[in-house]
Each structure stands twice: as C-alpha cells, then as structure tokens.
A protein has these predicted regions:
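Short N-terminal "domain-start" leader segments
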Residues: 1-34, 67-70
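A short, charged, amphipathic alpha-helix used as a generic interaction element across diverse proteins
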Residues: 32-64
Length: 71
C-alpha cells in the first residue's frame, strides 16, 4: 500500500499548525467529528511545525511532503 502524503500549514485564524493529508488529489485537514448530527468537526492542532511533522512521521501510512501546497 502506498503512503498518503501530508503537509503542515500554519493557520493564522486558529493560531496553530494544521496537518493536511492528500486523499485522491484533495487536501483534507486532520481532525475528528465531535457531533455528527450537527456536522461539527474539530481540527487536530499543533503548537509547532516540528510537532505536526513528528505526528505525520509517527503514522505508518502517512509520509511528510514539504512540497504539497494547501490553497
């Protein structure tokens, strides 16, 4: 199985680093659903870029790619 590619981006509004994973050409933020009925989603936030990259590297099926661009 190929590894999914991921990158980290600083979000000014959230004041945190967010991880995005490439899923079939779409860059999706990492997080979790906190209320499915209301469609509420919470981002997985990191204090530093290094923490975000360490999280990516700790996952066996995800690989960090600094060249992915989140728009």
């Amino acid at each position: 199985m190929d590894k999914m590619l991921a990158t980290s981006v600083y979000d000014e509004k959230l004041k945190s680093w967010i991880v995005y994973v490439d899923s079939e050409g779409l860059l999706l933020p990492v997080g979790r659903t906190i209320n499915e009925d209301l469609g509420l989603f919470e981002y997985c936030k990191f204090n530093t870029k290094e923490e975000a990259i360490d999280w990516i590297n700790s996952k066996p099926n995800i690989k960090y790619d600094k060249d992915l661009i989140v728009r």
